[in-house]
């Protein structure tokens, strides 16, 4: 788990201590007694707040790194300058919530509703024994925070499939590297918003009304040229499988630089050991149950790809973007080559977190994989 921005200034609570507070808040909302949850500047990292009625609760300045809010109602909730990095916020309702200055870096907000939410830049000032101090985000020591966005709402590297931002205030919001598939921005106020390197698919770009430089490096919808290559790519993968299972038939596939998204539904369960797919675009690609021993995915865009159940011994993900990729049950470690050498799986330089490999079948340590 990543360290919180606010470790030295917040009050920690355990799950056992938190549960009665949440239950009391639910009674309060239902007008059955209880008390509003006042959790400002509390440390709730990694705790379970899923499927709760949390409307109008106060989490301002709270540290909630890695917590789960799956399916909860957070309408009109106060999340002012809260730290929600790597949270599970899928299917939550954040209608008219105060989210100014909050950080959602790396979080999963897929299918969340943020209509009318206030997402403007802000910073929190705290009165203490030594006077007024500023509660600052240090961005985990990162150096690539875009200029002018240090106090902005941070959605960088988030998974935000089918999120609704209807009429939301998004001044200076940072969506760099986020997966914005099917997101609705109708009526939203988008001033000085940053989308650098984001996935913008299934979106009406006209709704964004942003200058071209704000879309630098973005992954957009599949082009007609890429769709026209589907048959050729399928044939090359079929030939690669034949090369694997036969004694001389087929040929190894070299897919470096290709857009593999048109192959969705074709790649799962295949024998693709030794595949070369460096610098490919494979956002959301389904590789489940594939045999990918010694495959090369160096510098590939594999955001939200599914490698569950794969044999990934000896695979190279060096420099790849693995944000929100899944590895449940994937086998990772070294493999012995025909000449007797051992080839180790590697993720050095990749955009990935340790939590993504929590359910993988690791035959080495994360340090052995080169995870930074």
Language-model features: where?
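Tandem repeat scaffolds
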Residues: 2-26, 30-372
């Amino acid at each position: 788990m990543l360290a919180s921005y606010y470790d030295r200034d917040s009050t920690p609570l355990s799950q056992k201590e938190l549960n009665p507070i949440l239950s009391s808040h639910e009674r309060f909302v239902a007008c059955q007694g209880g008390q509003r949850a006042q959790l400002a500047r509390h440390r709730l990292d990694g705790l379970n707040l899923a499927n709760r009625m949390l409307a109008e609760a106060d989490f301002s300045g709270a540290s909630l790194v890695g917590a789960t809010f799956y399916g909860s109602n957070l309408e009109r909730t106060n999340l002012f300058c809260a730290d929600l990095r790597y949270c599970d916020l899928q299917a939550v309702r954040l209608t008219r919530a105060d989210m100014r200055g909050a950080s959602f870096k790396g979080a999963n907000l897929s299918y969340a509703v943020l209509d009318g939410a206030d997402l403007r830049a802000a910073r929190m000032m705290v009165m203490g024994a030594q006077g007024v101090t500023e509660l600052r985000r240090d961005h985990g020591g990162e150096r690539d925070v875009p200029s002018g966005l240090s106090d902005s709402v941070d959605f960088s590297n988030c998974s935000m499939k089918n999120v609704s931002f209807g009429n939301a205030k998004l001044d200076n919001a940072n969506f760099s590297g986020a997966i914005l598939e099917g997101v609705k921005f109708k009526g939203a106020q988008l001033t000085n918003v940053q989308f650098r390197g984001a996935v913008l698919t299934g979106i009406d770009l006209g709704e964004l009304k942003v200058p071209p430089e704000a879309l630098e490096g973005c992954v957009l919808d599949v082009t007609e040229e890429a769709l026209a290559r589907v048959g050729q790519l399928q044939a090359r993968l079929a030939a690669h499988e034949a090369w694997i299972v036969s004694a001389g038939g087929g040929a190894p596939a070299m897919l470096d630089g290709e857009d593999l998204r048109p192959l969705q539904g074709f790649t799962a369960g295949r024998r693709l050991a030794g595949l070369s797919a460096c610098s490919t675009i494979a956002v959301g690609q389904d590789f489940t149950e594939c045999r990918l021993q010694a495959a090369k995915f160096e510098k590939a865009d594999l955001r939200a790809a599914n490698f569950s159940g794969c044999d990934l011994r000896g695979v190279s993900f060096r420099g790849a973007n693995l944000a929100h990729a899944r590895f449940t049950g994937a086998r990772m470690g070294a493999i012995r080559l025909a000449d007797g050498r051992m080839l180790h799986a590697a993720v050095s330089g990749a955009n990935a977190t340790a939590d993504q490999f929590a359910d993988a079948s690791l035959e080495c340590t994360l340090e052995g994989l080169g995870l930074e």
